Amino acid sequence: MVPPTAVNDAPAAGSAVSVKDPAKDTILTPRFYTTDFEAMAAMDLRPNEAELEAICEEFRKDYNRHHFVRNDEFEGAADKLDPETRRVFVEFLEQSCTSEFSGFLLYKELSRRIKTRNPLLAECFAHMARDEARHAGFLNKSMSDFGLQLDLGFLTANKSYTFFQPKFIFYATYLSEKIGYWRYITIFRHLEKNPDSKIFPIFNFFENWCQDENRHGDFFDALMKAQPNTVRGFRARLWCRFFLLAVFATMYVRDVARKEFYEALGLDARDYDRLVIDKTNETTARVFPVVLDVKNPKFYAGLENLVTNNAALDAVDASASSAPIKVLRKLPHWIANGAQMASLFLMAPVRSESFQPSVR
């Protein structure tokens, strides 16, 4: 497996590539995770071992081994973008590269730490680390077309790592992979119908790319079924609702805040996110015992309140006020966000067996 930092990123002759400072950490930026490796090593896979072995066999085939090969379309493509489109597209590349690299680090460390005690699980994580490394390297190479690159080694050493228990890793990464599938395939299908909106050739790779995300999500689906306590019982239902809400709300607020990127692709950020949320919610019903009632008008009304509060927080950040004054000015918006998230969490969920009986 080639780590992202080892991808051939040499700039063309006569060009200069600068190392881009990492984006400031906020609640909306991609997180780096670590977990209880001892608990992962001791995990009993027997309740669903056959399905996990079948998924591992799919990983071994490495369908996209020869997919991520740049072609002549990339030559000069960056020069065709106007300054504002360049700005929002580079931001998209940075966020996506950071997210993929975060997955690589987690999966690679898991595969290394549990290899001797849980070889099947370790092999699955090694294959997924391979995919994430490939994605991150491809994105970082595209950044070099704009004269910038992320120092992935620096990110490894200096990013803050959030500790999650294994079951929380399962919820978060399952949703991340499945929502990634729906995000990529939705953009690909839109641009297939509207080729004039394809601002950069990287989008040509999204159809096969999203299948990696889908297979990774299927792996975590099977892994949760091998650990029935993660998807059964009252507490499991609460955690499933919490992670669904956290992932959907974060994506919606972030995407509306950078709606200019989606406009450059001929998409409306809100419509795009609603479609992705609907599809991800439906897919999640295959494993989670409950899903969110995203058809309830109160759901998106609540997300819009979060968007408004987030915009107000950004305005405070951009002001010339002193740090203590900024905290005081932010306090009511933080409280409003907390109250709104609590209200959304307390909305009645939809039981998965009634929501999607055909797949259960």
Swiss-Prot record:
GO terms for biological process: light-independent chlorophyll biosynthetic process; photosynthesis. Pathway: Porphyrin-containing compound metabolism; chlorophyll biosynthesis (light-independent). Pfam families: Rubrerythrin (PF02915). Keywords: Chlorophyll biosynthesis, Iron, Metal-binding, NADP, Oxidoreductase, Photosynthesis. It comes from the Bacteria. The keyword Thylakoid does not apply. Its cofactor is Fe cation. Signal peptide: none annotated. It catalyses: Mg-protoporphyrin IX 13-monomethyl ester + 3 NADPH + 3 O2 + 2 H(+) = 3,8-divinyl protochlorophyllide a + 3 NADP(+) + 5 H2O. Its EC number is 1.14.13.81. InterPro entries: AcsF (IPR008434), Ferritin-like_SF (IPR009078), Rr_diiron-bd_dom (IPR003251). One of its GO terms (molecular function) is magnesium-protoporphyrin IX monomethyl ester (oxidative) cyclase activity. Belongs to the AcsF family. Catalyzes the formation of the isocyclic ring in chlorophyll biosynthesis. Mediates the cyclase reaction, which results in the formation of divinylprotochlorophyllide (Pchlide) characteristic of all chlorophylls from magnesium-protoporphyrin IX 13-monomethyl ester (MgPMME). This is Magnesium-protoporphyrin IX monomethyl ester [oxidative] cyclase. It comes from Synechococcus sp. (strain WH7803). The gene is acsF.
